Amino acid sequence: MAIDPQPSSPSLSSETIANDTIGNDNNVNEPSVEPKTQENQHTVPPRLSRIYSQAHHISQSFIDQNYPGEGTTQAPYRINFLPDDTQNAQLLPRWKKWAFVLLQSLACLATTFASSAYSGGIKQVIRAFGISQEVATLGISLYVLGFTFGPLIWAPLSELYGRKKVFFFTFMVATAFSAGAAGAGSIASLLVLRFLTGSIGSAPLSNAPALIADMFDKSERGLAMCMFSGAPFLGPAIGPIAGGFLGEAAGWRWLHGLMAAFTGVTWIACTVFIPETYAPYILRKRAQHMSKLTGKVYISTLDADKPPSSAAHQLKNALTRPWLLLFKEPIVFITSIYISIIYGTMYMCFAAFPIVFQKGRGWSQGIGGLAFTGIVIGVVLSIISFAFEDKRYARAAQRRGAPMEPEDRLPPAIMGSLLIPIGLFWFAWTTFPSVHWIVPIIGTVFFAWGLVLVFMALLNYLIDSYVIFAASIMAANSALRSLFGAAFPLFTRQMYDGLGVQWASSIPAFLALACVPFPFLFYKYGRQIRMKCEYAAEAANVLQKMRSLHVTVTEDDAMNEAEEMWRARTHNSHASAAHSHGHRRSLSYTRSV
């Protein structure tokens, strides 16, 4: 059952980083597929065709195409998406794309909602198990600690097994663990289940942005990311509001039941409606099944020039590479520390607000949760602000007529860096019971507004600065900020008892104030700093190569090239030092003679 190879012309290519950097030139170096002529057409048996079409949602016309290659192991057929391929996520109708973004944002909301909703039932957990406040707070910290490890594992697995399979498995198990937590018989089992739920349920935190990248090109991606970016912050802010009332009225077990129901409904909705979107996985599976059906050898054009990568290799890179970049690149380290401080401050609020509003003002558990309304308003304001910022950036890029610099992403971070300490100091010194309760809550509006502005702007800055290393950079940033988010609530009570409400609330404000110069420095000197950073400089070289030669470079290729450049520079510097030392010895000997 042969499919004769025919000469081909360029056709529509799938979305890659190269598409983003090259622009709209999708017609370079991609094999095309053309309908077979009647005389050459070989028909796949109807039974096999039906099975293949039902299982993999492709039509007979796809199998009947001609592809470059000979169908052998040495020269396999190279397949790509058809121009009107229904499985190409880039070609989905706009309303479907936005519906899928909404569903994935809801999945992230469900995950982060559960991280803080637990705080609404902490008093009941303390009474039920006879434990201290600090031990009960571990339910928040261990859940957020799961965010450190989960995305490092689920992100590479989603590239091997597809976004849909990873989401289906992780959210199914997270729903089961969340339901199990509702029936926990001891504090140990509750805490273990909380950690496992956070680790396994954190898949959308890394896979949702990847799904957005699968569906949207660079010109539209900013608005989609803006919509998604609110979920990781709205969830923690809404959690105590709902959790406070439910925990007070029905107890902590019903509160965990609500988390399980929220996760379960989201799991069903996303599984039913969102298709697989990752192009390399779709084409890889399609090639495998066509090889089985026809007896010929097929390969995806996206995998044709790459060595096969095992799950163990990808997991090793995913677990080690982010830390390498974090500690070797000053830009990554400084921005990640800044984001981690303000992210940890947000989670510190879950331990601090009950002290300020319930203990200090005598509010009930349910009413105390409403204190987080200010954070909700601040997050909404930041999303609106970023929608306008996205339009400003697009207009500036159009006027310039040339690629924008990464530093052009920083104006929102400059504004946000000022709003954060203003909001935190405002909150800290208006928490006196004699001051109206609305005043400190207004301070949290400015804090949350600035928090999301800084978060989004600095992440965009890192992505634009490191391009091909973006996945590892995001993993490093996510891991570090999750560690801070897990740690901050654990020492909050002791800090407030020792320093008092006002000075304890001022500590994160002083930390944020110390970080204010960073966005300004990066805006003014960022380019010079980047060119002195090993991997940032290599990313710039790769970006230039992709723009000029219209080639796609993988993260592994770029990492290897960067390491080779570093070894070459090290060797040259050692050789130069040895030569200089030898020259000095020669001069010394000449003088002595």
From Swiss-Prot:
GO terms for cellular component: plasma membrane. Pfam families: MFS_1 (PF07690). Residues 9-30 have a biased composition (Polar residues). GO terms for molecular function: transmembrane transporter activity. It is found in: Cell membrane. Glycans are attached at residue 19. It is a multi-pass membrane protein. InterPro entries: MFS, MFS_dom, MFS_trans_sf. Residues 1-44, 570-593 are annotated as: Disordered. The keyword Cell membrane applies. SUPFAM superfamilies: MFS general substrate transporter (SSF103473). PROSITE patterns: MFS. Fusaric acid is phytotoxic to plants such as cotton and banana. It has been shown to induce programmed cell death in plants. In addition to a mild toxicity to animals, fusaric acid exhibits acanthamoebicidal, antioomycete, and antimycobacterial activities. It comes from the Eukaryota. The keyword Lipid metabolism does not apply. Keywords: Cell membrane, Glycoprotein, Membrane, Transmembrane, Transmembrane helix, Transport. Belongs to the major facilitator superfamily. DHA1 family. Polyamines/proton antiporter (TC 2.A.1.2.16) subfamily. Efflux pump involved in export of fusaric acid, a mycotoxin with low to moderate toxicity to animals and humans, but with high phytotoxic properties. Constitutes a self-protecting mechanism of the fungus against critical levels of FSA within the cell. This is Efflux pump FUBT. It comes from Fusarium oxysporum.
